[in-house]
């Protein structure tokens, strides 16, 4: 089983699309959405979707702590053997996850890091301000 941690902040438009796409591609996944958005709380909507755990944090604590909180919660599920962290804005393409998971499993790896800064990588959906 795969645990996918998605830290979010003001990702109302993407969060549902991304989670549905991931669950369609990966039937053995549990998604942990760690949301720092103060004005929205999607807990009600996500409790209706199987294999999604929504964590709403009251204050914006930052991306790093959102990932750590997600990992802490996900690691309590002993069925999860592989942990993945993805951005909510589709800058990590859901379709590429399978290829990376295959490399991880076939390579008998303990850790696999993908980087958007490799020569063969592309950055999608980023404004010029974010790239700078």
Show which residues each predicted segment covers:
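Short beta-strand/loop segment that forms part of the nucleotide-sugar
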Residues: 19, 28-38, 55-57
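A conserved acidic beta->alpha catalytic loop
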Residues: 35-43, 90
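Short, well-formed alpha-helical segments that are part of the catalytic scaffolds
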Residues: 10-24
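Short beta-strand-to-loop acidic/aromatic patch adjacent to the donor-nucleotide binding site
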Residues: 79-91
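Cell-envelope/extracellular polymer assembly enzymes that use nucleotide-activated donors
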Residues: 1-3, 30
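Acceptor/aglycone-binding surface of glycosyltransferases and processive sugar-polymer synthases
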Residues: 57-74, 94-132
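Conserved short acidic donor-positioning loop in nucleotide-sugar-dependent glycosyltransferases
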Residues: 10, 36-38, 61, 70
